[in-house]
Design a protein with these regions (language model features):
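Post-HExxH zinc-binding segment in Zn-dependent metallohydrolases
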Residues: 103-140
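Second-shell loop/turn segments in exported
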Residues: 2, 73-77, 97-102
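Sequence contexts marking disulfide-bonded cysteines in secreted/extracellular proteins
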Residues: 53-55, 104, 143-145
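Short, surface-exposed coil-to-beta transition loops
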Residues: 56-58, 80-85, 106
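Short pre-active-site segment immediately N-terminal to the catalytic Zn-binding motif
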Residues: 71-87
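Active-site recognition of the HExxH zinc-binding catalytic motif
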Residues: 85-98
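Auxiliary, metal-adjacent structural segments of Zn-dependent hydrolase domains
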Residues: 5-71, 124, 131
């Protein structure tokens, strides 16, 4: 079942890469698909470096730039729009590694804004609310720290 899910995910990733190419300046031609692993909530939180019991933060997906692997929560469902948007977000990070950014937060801002656009195009009027992201958390995630 998991192997079938991962094979079907490849088709979805190709469709999402086309969407990324049509909605951003990120390079999507001649792109290899990253490996995808379905992992437990505990492993996602460990890879992110926070306690699984940390209130309000539920990690659903991560991209590791070093090994080029997308990690998705083991209950990821290709038919769930929010889950597809998590995969889209991590595919954006996969493509961002080829570009220059001032800071990691700038990459997050681009990924979130594209994810929000994708959700709006699919009838989610308030993507931040659907993703359980409040304005303060969004600012923290997407604002580069001042460098002196």
């Amino acid at each position: 079942q998991t192997k079938r899910k991962l094979n079907e995910m490849k088709e979805l990733m190709l469709l999402l890469l086309v969407w990324i190419g049509n909605n951003s300046t990120l390079e999507v031609e001649r792109v290899f698909l990253p490996e995808v692993k379905l992992v437990s909530s505990a492993e996602l939180h460990e890879r992110f470096g926070i306690e699984e019991t940390c209130d309000g933060i539920k990690i659903k997906a991560l991209y590791n730039r070093d090994n080029k692997i997308i990690y998705l929560h083991e209950d990821w469902n290709e038919y769930n729009l929010l889950d597809r948007s998590f995969l889209l977000h991590e595919l954006i990070h996969h493509r961002q590694k080829e570009s220059e950014y001032a800071c990691r937060q700038e990459m997050e801002e681009e990924a979130y804004e594209l994810q929000f656009k994708y959700l709006k195009e699919n009838a989610i009027n308030n993507p931040k609310e659907a993703l359980n992201i409040n304005d303060v958390f969004y600012i923290i995630l997407t604002t580069c720290a001042a460098v002196e």
